[in-house]
Amino acid sequence: MWKFNIIQNWNCIWEKNHIDKWNELLKQSPTSHVFYHPLLVQIWVNTYMPLRNLAPIFVWGESLKGNKVFLPLVLWKKNWKNAFIHTIIPIGYSDYDYHDPLFLEHPTDKELSSFWEELIAKLRTFNADEILLTGFRDGCHIKDNHWTQDEICPSLDLTKFSSEDDLMSFFGTKLRGDIRRQIRRLEEIGSLKFVEYSSVQEIPTGVFEQFMDAHCKKWPKAYKAPNFHNLLVESCSTNGPIHFSVLLLNDEAIAWHLGFEWQGVYYYYMPAGNPKYLKQSPVKIHLYNLIVRAINKGYYLYDHLRGDETYKTGWSDGFQYVNNRCVRNKCMSSKIKHCFIKLKTLIG
């Protein structure tokens, strides 16, 4: 039911004709998301190519009825520390939240089922030890026992708001009062200003470094690939798809945010706050400013992305889940590799 064409050459992938075809589908697809924007994909690839042995498996497909699909994957050939396991993963893997295929039209249940069945059969021909399909939202996976439900992804429908007052009315009494109180407390200290940057040249020296330092202190165990976030910020713009902003108090940064925006959706990706102002909740006030900005720009959704952090409850009115599937190679060599990894984990 599906015919696949797989691109396995990086030079072909970055050719203008291919990028144009990719961009066209990205703009038309009902399953479109910012994480498969060519810019974000290229930044991820440029980050990890010096760190990992990655080979492209960029899948283009067409059904008998003319539906089209694009799904960028890579074959990750791991080193001896990981038993030389070969794993097929989506582009972006753990750094990007969603990996939904880009369909030209919403696939029917039958079409979606055959897509996954036939694609997995095609991917098996690469003789990888495992195929890890992670980060596929509801509607882009099959509801069967092969797939497991993963993290919740809260979001806020912005179409119900036409102004900042509408947003305030939506918030619960406690949150609404806290926002007003913290803004008042900050303004008593000095001038409070929300600033976004149209290019990396506008970002004052030291701002990015302060942002990363604050984030690392808040989440010290979170892996950050060398230069990844720097490359993202270097491509920031007020017109997307990469957005970088700060909340200033008397010209001192008290909160930062690196996020994305694409086709009416704002993605709340990487916030950080200045620990010096922890009691004034600067991250919360920055989030408020970002949502107001999204309303003013006419966006229809504010996506809080993956995670069930408590704070998201008061800032969202909907949710969906991401789903995963793992397909293991049943050959003896693959079983031995996985046994080695399991034993290594048990030993610690």
Language-model regions, residue ranges each:
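Active-site/acyl-donor-binding loops of N-acyltransferases
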Residues: W2-F4, Q8, L75, R137-F170, ...
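A conserved beta-strand-loop-helix scaffold within acyl/acetyltransferase catalytic domains
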Residues: W2-I88, T134-C153, F161-S163, L167-K279
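Acyl-donor binding region in acyl/amide transferases
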Residues: A55-P56, W60, K78-D150, Q263-F319
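Short, surface-exposed, polar/charged, turn-prone segments marking secondary-structure boundaries
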Residues: Y98-P101, T159-F161, R181-R185, A222-A225, ...
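A short, structure-level motif marking secondary-structure boundaries and short turns
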Residues: L104, L167-M168, K218, N274-Y277, ...
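Generic hydrophobic alpha-helical segments
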Residues: F115-L119, L232, L343
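A general structural signal for short secondary-structure boundary/capping elements
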Residues: D178-R181, S199-Q201, R293, H304-L305, ...
